[in-house]
Amino acid sequence: MQPRPRIKLLFLLPAAIWVLAWTVFPFFYGLYISFFQIDFGSEDRFIGLGNYYRFFSDNNAINAVEVTFLFVIGSVAVQVILGLLLALMANRPSTTRGLVRTLLILPLFATPVAVGFLFFTIFYEEGGLINGLLGIKIPWLSSPGYALSAVIIADTWQWTSFCFLILLAGLQSIPDEVYEAASLETRNRRKIFWHITLPYLQPTLVLAILLRITEAFKVFPIPYTLTRGGPGNSTLVMPMYAHRAGMRYFDFGYSSAISFMTFILVMIFIIFLFRSIRQAY
């Protein structure tokens, strides 16, 4: 081996160690302990697929799956649509275009925990910002229907910026010549959007949807700080249920099984989405 390739491998070594230590090892170790019943003070007992069978007979787990899918579908749909609208507006020539783009991406830099606490003060029933402005008491955090909506709104406030950035980049990659040729046929902006902009933007749009779906399935800080999974279990998403099983009840084997079921559901959802897109196009 030549000295230069060795130097390249040497520089890659820290990154490889980091990935092995914080991604590969936790993944396989989590899969390993999901086949065990782990009790403190006694030896771990191998139970095979017992934790996974338990998952399908656990009403709280089934509820967490339903809540997670409602959250993912609701939040991703709103974020992609808002992100697209904002990208279309920000892509127009304007003297304040740079300032507007900067302001639109600021929420992305906030930590999710801070966002959760921020919206807790906004949605608080007694003295909260929204109820104070409206002059009525809406049970944002104590009603199951409102609570999930509050979590989706908080998540949307932060992650719409992500969709906006990706879709804005996609819009800017469309050649001007295409619009010039389209303008010779029609001046109708709606037709140009549906027949020119949207088809060109399709790969970027799919990328934004897939990235947001993957992240939305892993949501934890915002619902945890905003509602703690309540009222009842109305905002208990799967990552929170896995955290509760592991950190509150110290059932680490079952907690790992919940996490891997989340991973499996994400893969199924993405495969289904890919097939739907292929059939549509």
Protein language model features and the residues they cover:
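A structural signal for multi-pass alpha-helical bundles of membrane permease subunits
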Residues: 3-281
